[in-house]
């Protein structure tokens, strides 16, 4: 049951964030959006290092001086996987006027939801692979450590849910539909987590590769999407400060609970 609740916590964060559309009349200011984006980037980067890459290297200690190899290979596989999805799936970031990926006749709002969904895929995989390690009895991964990752991602999912539902509302969509689209953008997380758990439990020796794969995928999102969004235009210092806050919070959660 711990794993079941653990994989639902991040989805709950997205849903609660999307519910902001019922309580906030206006879209978020640039300063607030940069702060939330920076915070999310900090949490994801810290989670990639403390919750994924370091355990991946620790689990490969039997390889001696080559213990870094599974982490490096998995990391690059995750980067390339997200790079491929970025080119295959048509999507549109909220602050961008130009769609990415192949040409499509999809509505602007649909492509905005796809952008956040693409972002959520590695987060679901990260939670799934950590809980797979815990369920398989890996000494480096504890129930508290897995919970710390779930909580950290849920905290940064809250503003992400708001960032998708509020702009949709601002573009004329009904509140209920904007909320539903915000929620649906996070559905991929528990689905990805469950699929990752099922796959990882059958290939336990590959767990270091899967941990670092999730880290690579998450860091791709941070560098390709979040850091540019928090660094463009005005209020860039706000994004940087909240990046540090998010990183520190996730680091504290992982060390204190792990």
Regions found by a protein language model. Give the residues of each.
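Intrinsically disordered, metal-sensing/regulatory segments
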Residues: 1-258
